[in-house]
């Protein structure tokens, strides 16, 4: 594992200069700061930054790392953590990862340097090994929406596979014979689990798996539009789709409307997450509820309990998805 001396050697500066960069000293020139930060990133240097932060903890602050604050899913997550923080007379600091390992690492390290004693981290790009290292180093860190082996008691997760299984099975029971799946093109565990749930339901009901009925794109409105266009181009018999999330479902519905394909009388669709948009689409979207508000509340309480013995540790649970029936599904 890299040390501060390794960073100094690679950057061709003194150990004291590296220390000043880590402490955001104004006495360091911008060029020197950039060279040192590049060396830190290249060596994946973390331990001393963590140790420095942990040596003088600030128990009044909870750090939150999310992927994108413009996404309603993460806005709900942050709001839930903030409510817990407020109830315990604390404040929150937010770091953003943008689906990039370097950004996630930088966000976590920055929050640690800001002396956050508790962290709620939503990480999709960092490896299990690196997150294990953080969990081993940072007593008050909790992972949300992911499970790290050996630290299951500090991870808050959802059974994603069960969610898409429920969605696909509903369409099967409504008589649909040709069901597609619109997934995320991000290489994350959520996508693997949700696709596996769709495939498992087809297999359990003896439905054939058609490769052309599975398409991946960016997990947003535009990605849903592009994915639906691809599906309509390759498959003329499709009557239903399970979408990775509500945003992709909304994009898909837009394409169906543009092609004069009525939802749900001609085509059924089920989303995932139950974000506010699901209630305002036309028709209102049948979806799988992801209880991120409850999960984030639990994660924040767990993170606080790990650093404050006066706060009772909540019981460990894996949250379950539920089917929310609205008006985007109809029998065949």
Swiss-Prot record:
Entry-linked CDD domains: HTH_LacI (cd01392), PBP1_GalS-like (cd06270)
Record-linked Gene3D superfamilies: 3.40.50.2300, lambda repressor-like DNA-binding domains
Keyword hit for Aminoacyl-tRNA synthetase: no
Key words, A-Z: Carbohydrate metabolism, DNA-binding, Galactose metabolism, Repressor, Transcription, Transcription regulation
Residues passing through the membrane, by range: none
Cysteine pairs bridged by disulfides in the record: none
DNA-binding region: 4-23
Function: Repressor of the galactose operon. Binds galactose as an inducer.
Name of the molecule in the record: HTH-type transcriptional regulator GalR
Gene of this entry: galR
């Amino acid at each position: 594992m890299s040390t501060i001396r390794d960073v100094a050697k690679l950057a061709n500066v003194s150990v004291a200069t590296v220390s000043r960069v880590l402490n955001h000293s104004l006495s360091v020139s911008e060029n020197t700061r950039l060279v040192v930060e590049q060396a830190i990133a290249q060596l994946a240097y973390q331990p001393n930054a963590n140790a420095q932060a942990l040596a003088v903890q600030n128990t009044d602050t909870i750090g939150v790392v999310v992927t994108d604050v413009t996404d309603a899913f993460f806005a709900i997550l942050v709001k839930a953590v903030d409510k817990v923080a407020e109830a315990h007379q604390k404040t929150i600091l937010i770091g953003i990862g943008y689906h990039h390992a370097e950004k996630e690492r930088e966000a976590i390290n920055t929050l640690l340097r800001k002396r956050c004693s508790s962290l709620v981290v939503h990480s999709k790009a960092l490896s299990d090994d690196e997150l294990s290292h953080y969990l081993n180093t940072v007593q008050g860190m909790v992972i949300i929406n992911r499970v790290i082996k050996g630290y299951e008691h500090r991870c808050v997760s959802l059974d994603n596979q069960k969610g898409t299984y429920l969605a696909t099975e509903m369409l099967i029971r409504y008589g649909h014979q040709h069901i597609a799946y619109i997934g995320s093109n991000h290489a994350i565990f959520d996508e693997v689990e949700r696709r596996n749930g769709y495939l498992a339901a087809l297999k359990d009901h003896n439905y054939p798996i058609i490769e052309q009925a599975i398409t991946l794109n960016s997990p947003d409105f535009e990605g849903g539009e592009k994915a639906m266009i691809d599906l309509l181009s390759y498959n003329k018999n499709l009557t239903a789709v399970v979408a990775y999330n509500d945003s992709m479902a909304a994009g898909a519905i837009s394409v169906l409307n543009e092609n004069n394909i009525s939802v749900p009388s001609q085509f059924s669709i089920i989303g995932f997450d139950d974000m506010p948009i699901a209630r305002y689409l036309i028709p209102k979207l049948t979806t799988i509820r992801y209880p991120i508000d409850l999960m984030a509340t639990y994660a924040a309480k767990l993170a606080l309990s790990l650093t404050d013995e006066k706060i009772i540790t909540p019981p460990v649970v894996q949250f379950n998805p539920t089917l929310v029936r609205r008006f985007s599904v109809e029998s065949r």
